[in-house]
């Protein structure tokens, strides 16, 4: 019962963090777009955020294994509060270069915060589900991932609304205060021992020695790179500059998209028939859904290129893309926990989400470059190429896992 209570506390803290993270992303994007930043310059604002995610997940997995989930979770919340306060001191009289460096630093802190919090919440699931209960594990992973994205979408909307009503500075102060209260409450309720490994992990163990986890991590790099290469900068800027949408419209639309995407993730287990061993059917479904996602992305790219009812094509295409991507993401998030041992779950999850952050970093960088060079179509072509690579590696998971099982017999 105590484990369940701890899981609820960790999840609630992560939900609160996610709401501010989504709002901050939209605040920064919209605020600096109004200041005249180019698509590539907007992308650079998030580069350190994503880069720090790569490093944080590696080290955070080791910290969680050695010192417990409480330390990593509270550290993440505290760093996000600090990041929000720092950004509120941004001065329009500063030079462009100094302002950029200042925002990069604050965003870097936020990137560390986000991945410490996420790694903590994902690891906590494995600690409360019995080893053989694969179906429950999948459902809890899907529920957490889906609710996280739904709240991030709500955060996008919140960011747009706060920017319109309160302005940049007061919006940041409001979020920092709310998150600080959540930090105090979580510190009071959580025991220090949650998530500590019985064996003291060495720092070199942050790199996975498991072939299936390595392959899944590579697939994750390209899967999330494909999403962010057109979603982070290209799509919002296209909606603002080409379709002349307002800030509220862009924030609201992206919020609804992510909320819908999160809802689909939550219900993904109902679309997948569970296998007794927890992976055989799931691996086949993962490959099939990757192929479907590639076809959907190809259709969107062709529709935008030939200018076939651009707004409608984009709206329906985004709905289909979000649905397929949500199922793929939920499957991959489940598989990493299925492949992990309970005693080193934070190490495995940390390594895997380091790959996830690397994909977002690559996608964020390419989003600004591709859009500036070739527009939305160019960003979609890059996304499709990355999805094809992710599909190939996903298809390699089955043979890799079978070889591992054969060696253990």
Label every PLM stretch briefly.
Residues 78-96, 291-307:
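C-terminal ends and interior cores of transmembrane alpha-helices
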Residues 2-52, 214-257:
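Helix-loop boundary and gating motifs at the non-cytosolic
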């Amino acid at each position: 019962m105590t484990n369940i209570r701890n899981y609820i506390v960790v999840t609630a803290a992560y939900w609160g963090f996610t709401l501010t993270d989504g709002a901050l992303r939209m605040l920064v994007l919209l605020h600096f777009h109004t200041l005249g930043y180019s698509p590539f310059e907007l992308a650079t604002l998030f580069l350190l955020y994503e880069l720090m995610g790569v490093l944080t997940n590696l080290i955070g997995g080791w910290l969680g294994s050695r010192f417990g989930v409480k330390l990593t979770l509270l550290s993440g919340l505290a760093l996000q509060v600090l990041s929000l306060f720092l950004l509120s001191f941004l001065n329009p009289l500063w030079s462009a270069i100094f302002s950029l460096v200042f925002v990069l630093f604050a965003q870097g802190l936020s990137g560390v915060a986000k991945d410490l919090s996420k790694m903590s919440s994902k690891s906590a699931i494995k600690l409360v589900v019995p080893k053989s209960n694969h179906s429950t594990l999948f459902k809890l992973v899907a529920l957490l991932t889906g609710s996280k994205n739904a709240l991030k979408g709500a955060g996008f909307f919140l960011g747009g609304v706060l920017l319109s009503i309160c302005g940049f500075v007061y919006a940041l102060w409001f979020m920092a205060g709310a998150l600080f209260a959540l930090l105090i409450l979580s510190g009071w309720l959580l025991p220090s021992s949650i998530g500590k490994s019985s064996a003291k992990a060495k720092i070199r163990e942050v790199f996975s020695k498991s072939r299936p986890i390595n392959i899944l991590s590579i697939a994750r790099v390209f899967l999330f790179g494909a999403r962010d290469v057109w979603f982070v900068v290209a799509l919002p800027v296209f909606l603002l500059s080409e379709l002349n949408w307002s800030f509220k419209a862009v924030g609201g639309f992206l919020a609804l998209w992510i909320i819908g995407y999160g809802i689909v993730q939550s219900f993904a287990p109902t679309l997948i028939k569970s296998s007794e061993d927890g992976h055989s059917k799931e691996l086949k479904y993962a490959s099939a859904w990757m192929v479907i996602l590639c076809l959907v992305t190809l259709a969107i790219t062709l529709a935008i290129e030939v200018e076939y009812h651009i707004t409608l094509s984009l709206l329906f295409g985004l709905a289909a893309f979000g649905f397929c991507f949500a199922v793929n993401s939920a499957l991959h998030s489940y598989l990493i926990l299925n492949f992990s041992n309970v005693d080193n779950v934070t190490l495995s999850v940390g390594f895997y989400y380091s790959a996830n952050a690397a994909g977002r970093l690559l996608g964020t960088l390419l989003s600004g470059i591709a859009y500036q060079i070739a527009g939305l179509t160019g960003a979609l072509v890059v996304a499709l190429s990355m999805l094809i690579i992710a599909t190939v590696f996903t298809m390699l998971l089955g043979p890799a896992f079978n070889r591992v099982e054969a060696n253990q017999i």
